[in-house]
Amino acid sequence: GTLLIGGYGGIYRYKDTNPYISDYSLNVVNSASVYTLHRLGAKRVTLSYEINKKSLKDLVDAYYKDNDGYPSLEMIVYGRAPLLFTKYCPLKKMNQCGNCKKKQYELQDENFSFPILSHEDCTTTILNGKILNLLDEMNSIEHVEAFRLNFTIESKEEVIQIIEMAKDKLNGSTVSVFNPDTDTRGHFNKEIM
């Protein structure tokens, strides 16, 4: 099957044996990166969480000009972006090893809660306190072949609801699903200098 690869070591290991999609962690924001990944065999290139609308248009235009065709792109339009990867487990440091398998934990500051994903090897991923939600933007995003919904801590019911909202958007719904209290559009509508 098709692999999702987030590092160059994985690309070089599997490029000749498995079809693959490059992941967001390669931080792709320009046409040269897309071209290189396609040359290395990527069937589709996932764009960086950091890309904005103008950068996406510039990337697509430059790629088309240089290659007489559009790139095969994927974009994450829903999900909690990872903010920090740690080599240790905060629960283990507090002598509560194993509790992460029983319930969900989070870091709290004065404004937000940051969910903690615990992994089998006692590493952790700290997730953004706000959810990237570009579902309202999907129909205006051109030349992106696949939109990804990246689920991490959502319940089964939430997953079903979000998939239905995305399908409604792709079918032309104009009802906004963006919640300013819980969601962010990330950098998408911002100018990055």
Cite the ranges covered by each PLM segment.
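Active-site pocket-lining/capping segments in soluble small-molecule metabolic enzymes
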Residues: G1-M193
